Amino acid sequence: MNFCSKNAQMYYIPVGLTSLQKDLIEILLCMHAESFLEEFGPSEAVMQSAAQIKTEKEPEAVEGLGLGPLTPTQMNTMLLRHLRAVANHPCLLVDHYMPRKFLLMEPGEELIAMSEKFRVLNQMMEAILSRRRRQRPLQLVLVSHSVKELDLIEGFMLGKMVKIKRLSGTSLFDEKHQYTERGTAAAESNSTLTSGSTLKDTSPGSVEGKLSSGEAGAGYTTGGIKDDYDYQNSRRHMRAADDGAERQCDHEDWLFLATTTHLTHCTDLFDQYDVDVVLSLDPLLDVSLPALRSVRKQSKSVPLVKLFVQDSAEHFMLTRGISAEHEEDHIYDAVGHFIKNRGVHRQRLGMSAAALAEVVTALLENCEAATDLKSTKPTDTPSELSIVDALSERIMLLKLNHTPYELPLQRGPFSMKSYQLQLKQLIYARLEACQREQECKCAYILDRRMQETANLNRLDEVNAEAGRLFQSLKDEEKLVVDSERRLERTRDEHDRLREKSAHLRRRKAELEELLASSDLDSRVSSKRARLAELRQQLMPLEQQNTAMADSNEELRTRYQTRSSHAATLSSALASLRERKAALTKESTGPATCWMAASATEEHDRLQTELNDLVQQRHFLQKYIDTMKSQYAITNLDELNRTQHNKSGAATSRVRTTRATSPTYI
């Protein structure tokens, strides 16, 4: 597999770091800062950083462990190895192997959540495995740094729709998968379909069983088959054979797990496998290894996907073309680049989901490579930033808001045991600080929840009180409205009584005036005369009013009669309109149209037939006239009658005996 050729495909996927990985990296840097500056930095830099180093134990305690101190070169080599392990997965920082039961019982989501590289790998595997299953199954190779990393990968890959085969190390759980080559599997499937022995139903009640036992033949048999048709070639039988072959076909993908060391020492590792895609968690994987070149014989191009942490030491060496064999010669530049640029991981989220989906699509469709090293180049380091300042600051350390925590630079020298002990203590202290921070945040959240609950309770009380006040206000408004209505009625009654009182006062004044006057009789007489005059004027008015009342009654009666007649006509008109609408709908409906079309066609047919009969009559009339003129026929009716009598006499029968059958003469 030549990834440098024209048909080769190289994919470079940068990833970020999780909070746990960033904290562990800061702990490692504070452990190795002194040794890193002691080997690569100037002496004044060491003196400058010595003021910031906190002494936590005496040299006598280190010597009491019984092991010699580690040299700065060994410490820096360990730093590079540990940074690489943490960048892959935090669990790889442990020197011993993970227990098999722990990896089998640990939820895969927790293993994935610890590492950003594992999260991206899981997204890619989910996208690959969730594609259309009708396609050709893929054979994937996953290359890692170590066997421990393969154990973690197998731990969260178990249970997925893929067959896992460990090429390096011991499998956590042997699923007993047997690998067969694609050509061999296809040949076996074809031979199965050709022979048909595995798909035939040879039971005595089946057609195949009767045919095989000789019960079915050309003639009638006991089984009831009367023909010589070969039922093995029926459509139902062939469809059942196709379904059985499809079920026997292997649609599950294969995942082969190997390490870089195994690839280096085993040149024929992939000779018996038809590899489609190579996924490498080791960005420094040498593509010129014989194990990878052995796949070059294939006609197809096998893409290689490399996952690396952005601005890591491996990213630096990858862009500079430094191989894994010469990484110790460039350890200062690589680790120094990561130390100075590790702060950019606070804003970097790695490759977006859309870009990752494009990469997976390109892998499945065998398209051109979408990523290269130019698009994922390392971050430019500021020239004014010194390595001492970069080591002194805890840039990537997650800030704790409620728990005091400091991570000072650690002083050496360290032996192997003291180094592991100190590293474990720092990790444990950080874990305790994070747990206290979590407890403080949980307490803060619970306190806020209690406050919000109290606020909601007070709000409910305020709402209830507002409801009561609103109800009382409505009741008072109702009382006010009733009072206003009673006041209005009282005012109306008061005005009416006041007018009545004023009228009575006027009448009283008039009566008093009449009683006090001296000419009472003359005034009474004048009033009576006026009353008689008014009565005389009232009589014609009453007669006129009576006549108008009679006229109004007559007009009212006439109006009622005409209104009733108009209502009757209106109802009749409405019914006629409904009838018209129904008839219109019926006339324009499909049944009426069809009947009208049929009647029209029948009329046309009858008219054509009538025309034909008229023409035939004219023809016969002309023919008769012609025959009369040719043969001098004068009376056709007499001729017809004579012929009819002759024919009747010829076919008459006479009964001469008592026999039951007549005798014809």
Swiss-Prot record:
Keywords: Chromatin regulator, Coiled coil, Nucleus, Repressor, Transcription, Transcription regulation. GO terms for biological process: chromatin organization; negative regulation of transcription by RNA polymerase II; regulatory ncRNA-mediated gene silencing. It holds the Pfam family HDA2-3. The keyword Repressor applies. One of its GO terms (molecular function) is histone deacetylase activity. It is found in: Nucleus. Residues 181-219, 644-665 are annotated as: Disordered. Residues 187-205 have a biased composition (Polar residues). Its main location: nucleus. InterPro entries: HDA1_su2/3_sf, Hda2/3. Belongs to the HDA2/3 family. HDA2 subfamily. Required for activity of histone deacetylase complexes that are responsible for the deacetylation of lysine residues on the N-terminal part of the core histones (H2A, H2B, H3 and H4). Histone deacetylation gives a tag for epigenetic repression and plays an important role in transcriptional regulation, cell cycle progression and developmental events. Probable component of some histone deacetylase complex. This is HDA1 complex subunit 2. It comes from Eremothecium gossypii (strain ATCC 10895 / CBS 109.51 / FGSC 9923 / NRRL Y-1056). The lineage of its organism: Eukaryota, Fungi, Dikarya, Ascomycota, Saccharomycotina.
